[in-house]
């Protein structure tokens, strides 16, 4: 399996002058690390802006710098080159793009002021728009792949379901920390063991990108609730999975403090969508001509 990736993620010097922040560089590095750690090959796309305007260029919108016949001819050639890659290798898992880019934006692009909308508007950049049936993910979403799976683990059924969830997430190229596989699976623990488990779990939460919490039952597990609160206090997003059809009230799926501090989903498909797993974002069949 492979991804098509914007080349500036590997070489930020391809970007316009002065737009790259430290947070961008961290996201770029983590996106590349995800591919290495999850066994994804990377095929880098060409950079239309650099090929057309050169390096060390001033920032500009599509309408300001790229809206010319010569640029569209360049896009035609690059599109053919990319489709040759797809024909040889098969469809990619996704394209990893960079939001706001005039050419390679995913959710937003600097199109320019045409009197019909804001200069920065929703939609793909002009190059990624040439591949509408390939799912595209912004690098700041793709780089969030380390998951802490918070869930009750006291019964065999709970542990089996936790392992089932871990396997699903791993199959979608996430790295998952499962506390029951790190020693937190027994009631026979001395004080030293308890402290070691607590410290390990706190550290793993702090190093995670997202918490996935299982909150089934008449009342959510107390340990899971604490892990959710700890993550929320640290600014780590929490996605809460509640497959239980019982509700806490007329307007609440579960305790409001848990619901307001997380995104609650009802099944595994919604969980993968909330995590922006590339394989569930497919829009249709890719036609390579």
PLM regions: where:
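Short Gly/Thr/Asp-enriched flexible loops that form oxyanion-binding sites at enzyme active sites
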Residues: 100, 104-131, 223-232
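Short catalytic helix/loop segments, enriched in acidic residues and glycine
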Residues: 21-39, 165-170
């Amino acid at each position: 399996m492979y991804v098509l990736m914007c080349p500036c993620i590997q070489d930020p010097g391809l970007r316009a002058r002065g737009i790259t922040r430290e947070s961008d560089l961290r996201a770029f590095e983590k996106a590349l690390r995800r591919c290495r750690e999850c066994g994804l090959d990377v095929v880098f796309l060409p950079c239309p802006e650099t090929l057309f305007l050169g390096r060390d260029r001033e920032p500009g919108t599509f309408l300001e710098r790229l809206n010319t016949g010569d640029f569209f001819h360049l896009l035609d050639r690059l599109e053919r080159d990319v489709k040759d890659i797809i024909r040889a290798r098969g469809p990619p898992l996704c394209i990893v793009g960079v939001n706001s880019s005039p050419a390679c934006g995913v959710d937003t692009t600097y199109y320019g002021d045409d009197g019909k909308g804001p200069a920065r508007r929703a939609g793909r950049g002009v190059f990624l728009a040439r591949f509408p049936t390939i799912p595209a993910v912004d690098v700041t979403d793709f780089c969030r792949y380390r998951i802490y799976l918070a869930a009750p683990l006291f019964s065999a059924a709970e542990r089996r379901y936790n392992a089932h969830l871990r396997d699903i997430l791993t199959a979608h190229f996430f790295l998952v920390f499962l506390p029951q596989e790190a020693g937190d699976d027994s009631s026979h623990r001395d004080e030293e063991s308890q402290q070691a488990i607590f410290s390990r779990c706190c550290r793993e939460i702090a190093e995670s990108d997202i918490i996935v919490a299982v909150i089934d039952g008449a009342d959510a597990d107390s340990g899971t609730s604490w892990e959710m609160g700890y993550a929320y206090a640290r600014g780590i997003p929490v996605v809460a999975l509640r497959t239980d059809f019982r509700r806490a009230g007329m307007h609440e799926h579960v305790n409001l403090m848990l619901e307001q501090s997380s995104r609650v989903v009802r099944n595994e498909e919604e969980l993968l969508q909330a995590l922006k797993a590339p394989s569930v974002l497919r829009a249709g069949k890719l036609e390579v001509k």
